[in-house]
UniProtKB/Swiss-Prot annotation:
The keyword Transferase applies. Pathway: Carbohydrate degradation; pentose phosphate pathway; D-glyceraldehyde 3-phosphate and beta-D-fructose 6-phosphate from D-ribose 5-phosphate and D-xylulose 5-phosphate (non-oxidative stage): step 2/3. Transaldolase is important for the balance of metabolites in the pentose-phosphate pathway. GO terms for molecular function: transaldolase activity. Belongs to the transaldolase family. Type 1 subfamily. It catalyses: D-sedoheptulose 7-phosphate + D-glyceraldehyde 3-phosphate = D-erythrose 4-phosphate + beta-D-fructose 6-phosphate. Keywords: Cytoplasm, Pentose shunt, Schiff base, Transferase. This is Transaldolase. GO terms for cellular component: cytosol.
Amino acid sequence: MTDKLTSLRQLTTVVADTGDIAAMKQYQPQDATTNPSLILNAAQIPEYRKLIDDAIAWARAQSGDRAQQIVDASDKLAVNIGLEILKLIPGRISTEVDARLSYDTEASVAKAKRLIKLYNDAGISNDRILIKLASTWQGIRAAERLEKEGINCNLTLLFSFAQARACAEAGVFLISPFVGRILDWHKANGGKSEFAPAEDPGVISVTEIYNYYKQHGYETVVMGASFRNVGEILELAGCDRLTISPPLLKELSESTGNVERKLADQGEIKARPARMSEAEFYWQHNQDPMAVEKLADGIRKFAVDQGKLESMIGALL
């Protein structure tokens, strides 16, 4: 009998949510996603030391200013790890823009273009890269501009339907709605500590977004992310893509049985609503206290880990 990871792959594109090259070799995903926290974790792996050394040497050659060297080395390290991962996957790597730029459209566009140039200089074409941006209004506007210039984007830290709708209307390539962090919030702020997979608030959110996109003919890819258990993953079988951590990939690969399709495009197309204004976006997003909290919290956490990464690099300069 087949294992559940193999069965899931018949329904959904499986993406690895890690910067660990060993995990890529083991699970052979189509694509891979990284973020500042995963880059920080990957930087602790001894085999990656040469990638750090290369990034530092490159940064020293770019500027004599120490602060600029730290920023340059951080960018180059993220790309170096991405380059190693791209050797092992047929698809795309997602590399994230500094979370501290999440409310600055111009700076986000500039950082995205810098990351793309580093990949291009290493011989990697744009069709193998996704630029990750937080799903703030400013991040979505940055993505809209980048998409028009042939730079595909992955909009992350997505918790509200308003964020999902704004991303679709901006024509972004892919969104990453966070399943597990939605569940975390409801466990911490509600009277319920356990949810069946079909009743999981994160699963319900992604299902709603997926159905809305398909019903309105949006081409933006829906990639469920941030899973807490295999039940959430199986309940979203059929979603365009799912990005899964190595421990959960392992659990799926060690479980036998066929995975049942839960999400499907029914082929029904409805008229799209008028495009959201900035005021409508903020008002609708603000109606969801979970989304407001988790977006801000996610940006803060990624910014903290970016700072830790820069401190580590600074100590080596």
